Amino acid sequence: MTGAVGAVAAPRHTNTTAGAHRIADAFARARAGGRAALIPYVVAGYPDAEGSFAAACAAIDAGADLLEVGLPYSDPLADGATLQRASQGALAAGATFESSLALVGGIARARPRVPVVAMGYANQLIGGGDGRDRARALAAAGVAGVIVADLTPDEGGPFEAVAAEAEIAVVYLVAPTTAPDRRAMVAARSGGFLYCVSLVGVTGARTSLPPTVAKLVREVTAVSPVPVAVGFGVSRPAHVRAIARAGAAGIITASALVDALGPDGRDVGSLSALVAKLRAATAR
């Protein structure tokens, strides 16, 4: 007697998770308002736990639709000088992975309507295993999604699986140098949204963005089943306006906000004012 061999179920996509649905709802609210979603970035633990909590809440209150929280790391390869300085400052002030998640949990409880997306690196979030414990810890803290800056879909399958178990989305990145066919593949694997890097290089506020950014946004959006959010170099209302009008679903701003906090990292009023100006420029 022979028995039928059942088909092996395909791994669950992280875009079907509860976290991805929360992210989708945030993008949908912005779209219903005729604008792109604004996604400010803060570094967990910079200048210290209290200061970063204040900055996060101020960014949300000034108009954030989602919030990206960077987990401080000793070797942040994708970060420019501003974010490296903030990350080093957070570590010097005693920030750890655990304290960063405690901070995220506090933000999620204080401002529950705005999804939090954590950003880190593979050594932090996966290490030598599959990242299951870290994914569970992120979910327990209230994180909706996670960006692993140096993880590609080619190597990300095991982490996607444990993230799906934990109900959080795994957000991937594409760059101007990513080949068109690969952009489509990465977009198909990304959960929550797709992070479109606007320029070649590391993060950091720029006075201008590449003239090709609008074309890049249109091309990436055309092949992405999830919302496309554009980051790197976005620091001015004119940048936000141009990216929104090119059709991006979301706009990420990071270094400019850390700069706005001033030398001591505590000028929350200036950060709030900048977020409000950027939010006002998100209309399509």
Where are these regions (language model features)?
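Catalytic cores of alpha/beta
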Residues: 49-58, 178-188, 224, 230, ...
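N-terminal amphipathic alpha-helix/helix-capping segment at the start of soluble metabolic enzymes
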Residues: 1-39, 104-109, 218, 283
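Hydrophobic faces of well-ordered beta-strands that scaffold small-molecule active sites
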Residues: 38-42, 67-69, 116-120, 146-148, ...
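Glycine-rich beta-to-alpha transition loops that act as phosphate-gripper elements at the mouths
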Residues: 43-48, 119-127, 152-153, 174-178, ...
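Conserved, mostly hydrophobic/aromatic
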Residues: 40, 59, 67-70, 138, ...
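Glycine-enriched alpha-helix->loop->beta-strand junction motifs that scaffold or abut catalytic
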Residues: 63-65, 138-145, 164-171, 188-194, ...
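Glycine-rich phosphate-binding active-site loops on the catalytic face of alpha/beta enzymes
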Residues: 64-76, 143-155, 196-204, 233, ...
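Active-site-adjacent beta->alpha loops and helix N-cap segments on the catalytic face
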Residues: 19-30, 49, 74-85, 92-105, ...
